[in-house]
C-alpha cells in the first residue's frame, strides 16, 4: 500500500498539561472536529474516548497515554494524550521522546501550575517545539493575559499571543486572529458555525497593540524580518507565519492561543496552528544512534528510503490481541509479517500484525512508513525504550530515562489460586510500566511493589484486581530509603574455611569512596601482578553488588559508592568464586565501621496552594514535617508555597490540608532528590528494621 500522507503532511504531537486543565476534553474535540467520532464524550461524565480504562473513567483523570490518529486539512495528525498527574510522569516522558511537537494546555484561570512546570521542563530537555492553548476561557476568573504572563514569569518562556479572546467567562464568544487581524465569532453550541468578521470596535486598539508586540517578538528571532520591521516596511501575513513557524520549530518562540474545549470554541483554530507551526518529521534533526558493531554514531534521516529504525515507547496488554508494542518509526518502511532486530537486547523479533490505534479501538494496516506511530502484535522480548531496526543496518537509538521509584507497598495474595495469578499480573504490569518494580523479599518471601506515588500504586493494584481478577491484601505504603558511605576507607575481607576435603579461601583489600549523587555503584579493578587471579575479579564485584542490595545499616539498597579492589591473596587449590564473593561481602561489612554509612530518604518538591488566610497553617505544616520552604508566590487571594519535604512525612497530608483550609487547599508533589536523614530519624529506622 502506498503512503497516504507525505512526510511534510504528517504531524506527531502530544497534548500535555497540569491535571484538570482540560487536556482530554481538548483531545476529544480534536477527534470530533477531525471526524473521528460522531458524538462528543465528556470527561466528567466518564464517557471520554481517550480515557478508555475503567479507572480513568471513574477518576476522571488520564493514566496511560492513549495514541490516536486523525486527519485535518489534508494532513495526518498522530496524537498522544498524556496524563497530567505527577505519579504518571514516565507516561509523559516516553511520549515526549517520540513526538515532534506538543500542545501545552493551560487552565486560563490558573495559568502555569506545578505539573505544567514539570512537563514543560521535560519537553525542554527533549527539545520539543510547543504551542500553548489557554483553555477554559468560559470559566469564572478566566484571564488570558494573566496566563500568558505566567508563561514568562514561571517558565521564562518567550511566549506571545497569536490570538486574543472576545469576552471571557459566560461572555466568551469569539477569538481575534492577530495574524489575519479578523474576528472569529461562534454562533452555535457545537462550534461548527464560525463567522469571520471585522474586529469589534472596542477591541481594535488592543488587537493593534498585541499585533505590534507579536511582530516585534517574532522579528527578534529573524534577521530579515527585523530589517524590514526597523525600516518600517509592511510585513505580510505569509512572512509573519513563516517566521513564527521557524522560531517555534527552533524552540525559540511559543505561540499562545485561547479557547474553551468544553464549549467547543477555538479547537479548530488550534488544529490550524498545529499544522501551521509545529514540525513535520522532516523539520526536526535526524535521530542519532550508535552502531553496536562499530560503536560509531550514526544518523537516520526521516525517509522511506533509509534502513528501518524505530523506538518502542510503550507496552500495553490488550484483552483481545494480547501484548501490544507501541513504536515510532524514524526511518524506513516496515511490513507486517517481517522480522526486525531489537538492537537493545540483541534479539530478532517477528512483527505479527501492525495496528493503527484510535484510543482503544484499532485498525489493521499492512505497512508503516517513516514518521508513523503504530502498535505491533507479536513482539516477545521488546520493552519500553528498545530500538527496533533493519537486521542489516543496526543502530541503537537513545533510550528513555526511567526515574527510580520512591514508594513501596507489600502485597499478598488472598488464596493459593490468587498467588499464581498475582505473579503473572504483576509481571505484565511491570512490562507496561518501567517505573513499577516488583521484588520478592528473600528473607520473608513477601512481594514488594514500588512506584512513583500513592496514586500510581493504587491504580496498579486496582488494575491487578479488575483486569487479572486477583484478590490481594495490601500493606501500608513504605518509603524507599537508600544507604551510602559518606567517608573513604580501606577494608580487608578474608574468608578461609578448612573442614576436610577441599577448603575455601578468598582474601581481598578494597578501597571504598563516596561517589557523586546519581552515579550509582562503580567498581574498579586495580590488581597488579595477579595477586587476585583474573577469573575471580567478577566474583568480587558480584559479591559487593549482592551485599549492597541489602545495605549495612538497615537493609536498604546502597547507592553512589566506588569500590577499588587493589590487593589480596589466593590459594592454588582452595580459592573459588564463592570464596571471593564472601570475602568481598566481608570487606563491605568491615568498611561500614569507618566509612560513615548514612541512610538517604527521598525528598519531594511539594507545591501547596491555599487561601491567604491559611498561609500560617501551611508554613507550620512544612516545618512540622522536617521541610524547608523554597519559595512563595501570591496569586490573587491565594498563596502558593514551594517546599522540599521528606516523603516519609507526607503520608496523610491531604486530609490535614483539607481540614486546615476547609477543603480549599490543594497540593502536588514530585520526587526531587535523595538526602541524608537526621541522626535521630536514622536511629529510629535502624531500630524498627532490626525488630527492636
UniProtKB/Swiss-Prot annotation:
Q: Name one Pfam family in it.
A: EFG_III
Q: Which biological process annotations from GO are given for this protein?
A: ribosome disassembly
Q: What is its main location?
A: cytoplasm
Residues engaged in binding GTP: 17-24, 81-85, 135-138
The UniProt keywords, alphabetically, are: Cytoplasm, Elongation factor, GTP-binding, Nucleotide-binding, Protein biosynthesis
PANTHER family in UniProt: RIBOSOME-RELEASING FACTOR 2, MITOCHONDRIAL, TRANSLATION ELONGATION FACTOR G-RELATED
Question: Which named protein is this?
Answer: Elongation factor G
Organism annotation: Streptococcus agalactiae serotype V (strain ATCC BAA-611 / 2603 V/R)
